[in-house]
């Protein structure tokens, strides 16, 4: 079985090199040769651990999907500023994928009754940090698009037409608005919540690693961050490499969301 998968992969690589396979078909072929896929994703954070995360991913030959917002960083700027632009460009060159996390890390708080749809939104970054206000669907879409456009500008790579709402806080109306402007929401699996936002006093890295290795299942979308201000004992890189190695030993393989069956058609049509 393994040799058959290798032969199939080699054939597609040759076809890709010759220009006879389009990227979407390549993604489907890769997914077909991966029997136990998981989809590791990272949301932005203070970025203090970002170089270490990149080192682990490169060493383990793992591609991931990053969801980016312009969040405050330990370098006194934001995670999409010029200081971090080379870091993002390097991740693109390695074959990682990108999506929006809303530019201002904008939390949905509630729907506003009436038409057209509008929402109570509270950003945790940018000039309106901590201030709740009403946004129209167009304003919310513009904030999603602003992050995507910035990623494209600094990486030279078109981000996926996907986004992750901060905190996973959404409503049907909010998701419909986002899809209406070309962005499909991506959450995460219950077992895929890797726990790096939890207090390290109660949830040690050892405990989180054991829990993840015991509960993650094929097809799960996994969630971690590029630095959490409140966690005293950082989850990465302490848990990241052991998690990747442990999942590989269990027969799992890592794929980006470009290859996820729930999003392939959406990506191809947008």
Give the location of each predicted region.
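Bacterial N-terminal signal peptides
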Residues: 10-20
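Active-site beta->alpha N-cap acidic-glycine motif
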Residues: 28-135, 143-161
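Sec/Tat signal peptide C-region and signal peptidase I cleavage site
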Residues: 22-27
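C-terminal domain-boundary segment and adjacent tail
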Residues: 28-33, 64, 74, 232-270
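Histidine-centered catalytic micro-motifs
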Residues: 98-105, 168-170, 223-226
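Bacterial N-terminal signal peptides that target proteins for export
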Residues: 1-12
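His/Asp/Glu-enriched short active-site or ligand-binding loop at hydrolase and phosphoryl-transfer sites
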Residues: 169-215, 252-263
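Acidic-and-aromatic substrate-binding clefts and catalytic sites of carbohydrate-active enzymes
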Residues: 44-49, 70-83, 106-111, 162-172, ...
